[in-house]
Amino acid sequence: MTTLAVIVTSVAAVLAATAQTVQVPIFEYDPTFPKPLPENWAIGAIGGMAVDRQDHVYVIQRPGSLRGNERFTGSGDTPAKADCCIPAPPVLEFDQGGTLIHSWGGPGTGYDWPQTEHGIFVDHKDTVWLAGSGDKDAHLLKFTRDGRFLQQFGKPGMSGGSADTRNMGKPANLTVDPASNEVYVADGYGNHRVIVLDADTFAFKRMWGAYGNKPDDTPPGPFNPDAPPAQQFRLPHNIAISRDGFVYVADRPNNRIQVFRKDGTYGNEVFVSRRTLLQGAASGFALSADPQQRFLYMIDGANHHVWIIERLSLKVVARFGQQGLWGGFLNVPHAITVDSRGNVYVGENFDARRFQRFLYKGLGTPKAGTIPVTTIVR
């Protein structure tokens, strides 16, 4: 297995002080995942990632983000300018070996494909849910795992803001609660809310903003890290439900994750890289695979890290990853998911346009130096 030299940054002193007491998840970069794609396919920016009950890994990517020199074969030019490349279909499904087993997506009959592919989730019925963050994206889509269209909620271009219960507003991501068969949406790039619908009928159930407040679309103004915490979401970018019934929401530009009960009652919050500007630090997260789901793995798209957070205490305990385009490094991580074995999958945006697997190696005490992936204790 290829090893990766990682330079330990300024938290090394903290590492030395806590190394004897802190046990954190340790990961190793897996250079074998995924296998090469067929037909000279190229992938664009990664919108979202998910894992199903079979531990198959789903990726939704943006073919439209490929540049001209990355799509010569599919450009329609005669003769073709080069052998590479053809944009891959938006939805890709891989088995645990990294082999592509299904690919589908794009415009079709009976539904409106998103302008900008973003969120993906596979529920307890093996239904694949999709969300888009383009300017006109105000809807959700449901498909079978092999790409047969099932249902659409909302209509493109029809968003009525955060009070609208018939449309979304550039939704970022979603999750389905199997206990109640409800879909929870981080409705996010246009609106500023969590909205909950019946997963079959799309009947409206409830919605809330930051701290459980009524959603408010009043422009919040530029982010100021020295100001009191914003009382509304700036951009709820990711959402997940823990096994013990708590709802976690990543509010990206506010650099925080907030915790709620399923009825929208506010519980707690954690700020990570609180002074981050740009697009914000709290790009998304996944829950660890152990029965207690002890950890949150939060991707930080601005600082190019994965932060490890104790879920119940919300204490930031470690991180891995640093900026770079080499295997095992990170460049604008935008999506994250975890399989049943605890392996972490990270999808990247902008120039990286890739997804990587980090193998879970158990709990341990990380050490500074040259190891496959350095987990740095905070």
In which residue ranges do the predicted regions lie?
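Bacterial N-terminal signal peptides
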Residues: 2-14
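Eukaryotic scaffold repeat domains enriched in small/polar residues
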Residues: 17-378
